[in-house]
């Protein structure tokens, strides 16, 4: 009886550990995009706008499954739609990210890059360093 109870308790604890990414931070795409999971269903995406050479921060919702983290549409867009389609997903095993793009009335895969775990402080530092590097390179071209 104790073995069965221990097994059930272990399964419950393991399942909760797998199902939570709150507080985790990922940096992707050669330090140009980051994901800070700030709550159980909200992720703050930071990145570099390559056209304007500045940083942006956008809050999205996300859904976690056993194998992937689905990044959903903007939180403000969720108020308008009842069901939210994923705009990308991160594979939990290898931290590869796939982004979807809406082209010609259809969703298609747009990007695929790798992510790595980091801290939110390191995320901000690395994105700012990458932005400064891009500004220097762009300045030399002018």
What are these regions (language model features)?
Residues 23-53, 85-89:
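Short, solvent-exposed loop/hinge segments that bridge or flank secondary-structure elements
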Residues 20-27, 65-74, 94-98:
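Short, hydrophobic/aromatic-rich segments at coil-to-beta transitions
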Residues 4-13:
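Sec-dependent N-terminal signal peptides
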Residues 15-19:
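Sec/Tat signal peptide C-region and signal peptidase I cleavage site
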Residues 41-80:
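Central antiparallel beta-sheet cores of small beta-barrel/beta-sandwich binding domains
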Residues 9, 139-142:
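Short, solvent-exposed mixed-charge patches
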Residues 32, 72-138:
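Beta-sheet ligand-binding and adhesion/scaffold domains
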């Amino acid at each position: 009886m104790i073995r069965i109870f221990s097994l059930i308790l272990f399964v419950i604890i393991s399942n909760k550990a797998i199902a939570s990414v709150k507080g985790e931070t990922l940096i992707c795409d050669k330090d140009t995009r980051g994901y800070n999971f700030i709550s159980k269903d909200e992720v703050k995406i930071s990145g570099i706008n390559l056209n304007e050479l500045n940083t942006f921060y956008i809050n999205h919702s996300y859904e976690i499954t056993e194998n992937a983290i689905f990044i959903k549409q903007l939180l403000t867009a969720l108020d308008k739609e009842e069901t939210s389609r994923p705009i990308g997903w991160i594979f939990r095993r290898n931290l590869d990210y796939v982004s979807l793009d809406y082209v010609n009335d259809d969703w298609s895969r747009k990007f695929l890059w790798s992510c790595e775990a980091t801290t939110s402080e390191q995320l901000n530092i690395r994105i700012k360093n990458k932005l400064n590097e891009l500004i220097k390179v762009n300045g030399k071209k002018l």
